[in-house]
């Protein structure tokens, strides 16, 4: 196993690992799913419409992360077909544009929390029994620089999105504290401003660039750092 400058131990490939990626049909999620497959993982690509999953080497998985029944059935299917699960990438997200809190529509808040925070909670909850059967299973959850509450970075609107990503930080810290001694490696990642349907055409990063650090985190070997926020292969403050 190679050593990174951060002292993180990386798996050289993911052969034999089973991974599920939510929101895997476009943008960063599609790039993550493709890269995990190239590393040898068996990839389940979660989507609200499984017909949108076109990669022949991926298993299309119906999974609206706001539908608890679909999430449960998706994880049950992975268990039936594979008997194990090693990597969960919580990527599905929404980004409603809004001004400051007093201008926000509460329906936007509810929808954003349902997808961006409750979704990762539900997926991880149902996946945990399988994840904990292995050694060093990984949970990677997409966060954002807009959810960092240090360095005076919480102004500028988008309250629903910002608060949902603050919650992702709490989820990540909780998973490490609660399950880290059982071998779970849980981290969050800021992919940067990426040219996607959410990020818009003016964003400086390509989806493949945005996927690099999430895929890197999915390669973390047992005992690697957990409960942290990362960007560009480096730890950053919450």
What residue spans do the PLM features occupy?
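Catalytic loop of short-chain dehydrogenase/reductase
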Residues: 94, 106, 110-113, 132-181
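Hydrophobic positions on the long internal alpha-helix
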Residues: 89, 123-127, 131, 171-172, ...
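Active-site Tyr-X3-Lys motif and surrounding loop/helix of classical short-chain dehydrogenase/reductase
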Residues: 73-80, 99-114
């Amino acid at each position: 196993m190679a050593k990174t400058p951060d002292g993180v131990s990386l798996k050289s490939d993911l052969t034999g690992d089973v991974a599920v990626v939510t929101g895997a049909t476009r943008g960063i999620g599609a790039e993550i799913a493709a890269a995990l497959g190239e590393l040898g993982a068996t990839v389940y690509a979660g989507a609200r419409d499984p017909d949108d999953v076109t990669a022949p080497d991926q298993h299309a998985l119906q999974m609206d992360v706001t539908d608890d029944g679909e999430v449960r059935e998706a994880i049950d299917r992975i268990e039936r077909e594979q008997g194990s699960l090693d990597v969960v990438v919580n990527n599905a997200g929404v980004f409603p544009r809004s001004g400051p809190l007093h201008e926000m529509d509460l329906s936007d808040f509810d929808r954003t929390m349902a997808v961006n925070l409750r979704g990762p909670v539900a997926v991880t909850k149902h996946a945990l029994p399988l994840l904990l059967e292995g050694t060093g299973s990984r949970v990677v959850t997409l966060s954002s620089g807009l959810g960092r509450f240090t360095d005076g970075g919480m102004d500028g609107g988008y309250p629903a999105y910002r608060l949902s990503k603050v919650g992702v930080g709490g989820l990540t810290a909780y998973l490490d504290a609660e399950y880290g001694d059982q071998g779970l490696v849980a981290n969050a990642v800021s992919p940067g401003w990426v040219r996607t349907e959410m990020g818009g055409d003016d964003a400086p990063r390509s989806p493949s660039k945005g996927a690099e650090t999430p895929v890197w985190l999915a390669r973390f070997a047992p005992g690697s750092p957990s409960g942290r926020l990362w960007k560009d292969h480096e730890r950053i403050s919450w």
